[in-house]
Amino acid sequence: MPNSEIGMLLTYLAATADRNMETASSYLSPDVKLVFPQGQFDSLSQMAESMAGRYLSMGKTHDTWDISTAEERTVVVTTGTLHGVNLHGVAFAGVRFCDRFVVRSGLISEQHVWNDLAESGVLDSR
């Protein structure tokens, strides 16, 4: 049911934003593929290590959710904007993002992330 996927994804994203990797990891399949602008990762700990030193906090405001279910998977695409605080303590908002998730058997098997953080310059603002 699509609403259950959205609820699960929101819980997962909140746990990652809060850096509660144990809870967030419980939503991932053992063979998860995490693809971010900084590279591809097989675990949240790898992803978090790569993201360390980029910003102090990050959150998402979701504008759209698109869901497609076929055979044994559900694909969910969400778009919106990022907000947070960079390493210099400067708040930012309004940075575009797009996340694509593949959910199989109730677990996230893929997460693909696109955003305009690098292009926007907000991480370097002082």
Q: For each of these PLM feature ranges, what is it?
A:
Residues 1-26, 30, 125:
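Short, low-complexity N-terminal intrinsically disordered segments enriched in polar/charged residues
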Residues 7, 60-62, 92-95:
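Short solvent-exposed loop/turn micro-motifs enriched in small/polar/acidic residues
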Residues 12, 23-25, 32, 47, ...:
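Hydrophobic pocket/interface hotspot
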Residues 21-74:
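A solvent-exposed, acidic/Ser-Thr-rich amphipathic alpha-helical stretch
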Residues 28, 82-84, 115:
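Short beta-strand segments enriched in hydrophobic/aromatic residues
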Residues 72-82:
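A short hydrophobic beta-strand element
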Residues 81-105:
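Exposed beta-sheet edge and beta->alpha loop/turn motif
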Residues 110-126:
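Low-complexity, intrinsically disordered terminal/linker segments enriched in charged
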